[in-house]
Amino acid sequence: MGDDVLGRGSRRDQEIVLVDIVDDDDHDDVPAVRRQDSLYVDATRAGGANHRGGQEESWARTLKLAFQCVGILYGDIGTSPLFVYSSTFKDGVRHPDDLLGALSLIIYSFALFTIVKYVFIALRANDDGDGGTFALYTLISRHAKVSLIPNQQAEDELISKYNTGKPQATLRRARWMKELLETNRAVKIWLFLLTILATAMVISDAVLTPAISVLSAVGGLKEKAPNLTTDEIVWITVATLVVLFAIQRFGTDKIGYLFAPIILLWLLLIGCVGIYNTIKFDTGVLRAFNLKYIIDYFRRNKKDGWISLSGILLCFTGTEALFSDLGYFSIRSIQLSFSFGLVPSVLLAYIGQAAYLREHPEHIANTFYRSTPNVMFWPTFILAVAASIIGSQAMISCAFATISHLQTLNCFPRVKILHTSRQYSGQLYIPEVNFLLCVGACLVTIGFKTTVIIGEAHAICVVFVMIITTLLLTIVMLLVWKVSIWYVALFFIVFMSSESIYLSAVLYQFVHGEYVPVAMSVFLMIVMTVWHYVHVKRYEFELEHTVPRDKVKELLERRDIQRVPGVGLFYTDLVQGIPPVFPHLIEKIPSIHSVLIFVSIKHLPIPSVDRSERFIFRHVDKEEYKVFQCVARYGYRDPMEEAKDFVDALTENLQYYIRDVNFYTTGGDQHIFRSTSYASSIAESFASYEKHSGHAVYAEEMLTPAESFSEHTKQLSGRSKHFKQFQVENMNMQKMEKVQQEQQAILREMENGVVYILGESDIVASPHSSLLNKIIVNYIYSFLRKNCRNGEKMLSIPRSQVLKVGIAYEI
């Protein structure tokens, strides 16, 4: 082929060569493309963005974040002392030492699960600062192709935040785990189902947490107004819940600064009351730090002691919200505030209540308020209600964020998502979901009336999510982290065994109330699974029926096809090839806009994508047709822009593409820069994709692996003798004028107007498919689609500029 060696000394001391794009048959040893107008040009230009280095966080900022996260993260876990003892001893305290056994279980369960597992292990398994089971799944998705949607592209790995590290790939167990996840479809499906089960439990928890927290806090009124009936307490709680959910539409931006001081006062209060009760009633409860009392507790109570674990585990509720909201804070700030703020206060509260109950075991049903000194009752009551509302707010916000993330995976029907803060993109409000959560919380409160039964339902959500988190963390340790297999085994055995014991305890009491979160979670899982299943099937159908290249060329060259002024943005899910709805449009309306852009909105398994790396383009066939394919890439936390802002950004990046694609073209032959080592890695990516996804990548879209041109420019700018060899020879005035004319033509057509073309596919089950498939597609999915938001509303597209093209798919 006659490669010309132009220079050595890139950042990896790799050989840089100039490659002629020629037929594959002549050079089988070099991964090359048939077309230069590929998505590669923009991907490499964008991929040159610098990583945000791991800058050391100052202690001033750490302390500030530590203070702020007290209000956001610890409302739920900090209000657990309101109901733990009453949920543990449902039938009263049978033996005084049972309190020591329960306290010992609380201390060591709290330490094991919240401190060891979540604060010092799980927080490190974050996805670029984002936490939660969903983030664990996306972290795994970046290191192994586990997505059920076959839309992976090699260009995605060029994004600066798409950092897989890959030094651990040399480990045999990492390769084994990667191979297992990518080649075994059953494993992919189970991993997906576990993830959506965990997210369904988190959403269900957003119903139960407000119910149990507010009911526990309001229940304290009985101490000062004993004539209040249970029903009256319930209706006061319902009224409080309605107000709580009603104010969600306003967001917490304006009052959020009050959360941290309120929760901090709450923690100081319960800690001080705990010290007071311990000194006044029984300092002997400190013996509970001896593990012997746990053994004695189970010996004495046997089966009843095992069942009581469903109440004990409520002491670490809120840990998943803590993990999920990691994105707003740093790991060090959470570890600092948790270790020196939350842990002492909460443990002192539990110790103090145990000391009080040693003398007043008959007050077990309302331990918290009975153990509070009379002079402190009203301040405690006010802070308890405020803290329970703040803790509930954290879970509601967590549910909104979870559903927003699920939509990016196409696992949830389209719902309206509003951003309640211009400053903080993570503050969301979803009207439909908010209404359903409010109705659910009110019905649970009215139906169960007591915190004991709601606590049993709450417990199953907590333990299910913890077990799934343990499984996902184990995969992360094997696939991503470079830790000893013995540490992985120790982690899995310790946490899976202990959490399974807690799970068995809550499942034993399934009929008492646990069916509520299970029923809600099963319902949500059915909705999410059906939605995702049909989306995957539709994508596979379109991928199998993409319009062949010669057919596209034939359509574009037809003389009866009229080119009308303006720009057409043709939205499609496909990132590869032309969708089958395009020729259907031409048959019905034999005209094409002067500039036609096939736009694919693609969400990547990373939290965010820099704006400079969002768009990648390629020409569809000849340049003079002015038909492009564009992929707009977003992270799962990135909000969608308004239509006008999106078009402006697309136009700007299209101008860059036109400039770059001509800059990379030098004369009659086409050349691009290529890094030899990087070439092999991208070639491997394509081979792996074809092998494991079962879908071939079309030849005209295969990308020539290369380094970012912008990075090479930086490297070579200080080396004049080498830089002269890289100068593009034919970028003369005539070439520059051609580029400017093409750019101006695009701008003129943009001024003529933009039309958004949406393919409205009517999905029906194939007549030869199974009965289950017909029920899923023709009934469940059809119902969900008819009752969710339209595509143009989700994309914020003006209705006056929308053109819908209907087509039927049989799957």
Swiss-Prot record:
Residues 1-64, 124-188, 248-254, 332-335, 397-434, 481-482, 537-811 are cytoplasmic. Coiled coil: none annotated. Keywords: Ion transport, Membrane, Potassium, Potassium transport, Transmembrane, Transmembrane helix, Transport. One of its GO terms (molecular function) is potassium ion transmembrane transporter activity. The chain crosses the membrane at residues 65-85, 103-123, 189-209, 227-247, 255-275, 311-331, 336-356, 376-396, 435-455, 460-480, 483-503, 516-536. Disulfide bonds: none annotated. It is found in: Membrane. Pfam families: K_trans, K_trans_C. It is a multi-pass membrane protein. PANTHER family: OSMOTIC STRESS POTASSIUM TRANSPORTER, POTASSIUM TRANSPORTER 27. InterPro entries: K+_transporter (IPR003855), K_trans_C (IPR053952), K_trans_N (IPR053951). GO terms for cellular component: membrane. It comes from the Eukaryota. The lineage of its organism: Eukaryota, Viridiplantae, Streptophyta, Embryophyta, Tracheophyta. Belongs to the HAK/KUP transporter (TC 2.A.72.3) family. NCBIfam families: kup. The gene is HAK27. This is Potassium transporter 27. Residues 86-102, 210-226, 276-310, 357-375, 456-459, 504-515 are extracellular. Its main location: membrane. One of its GO terms (biological process) is potassium ion transport. High-affinity potassium transporter.
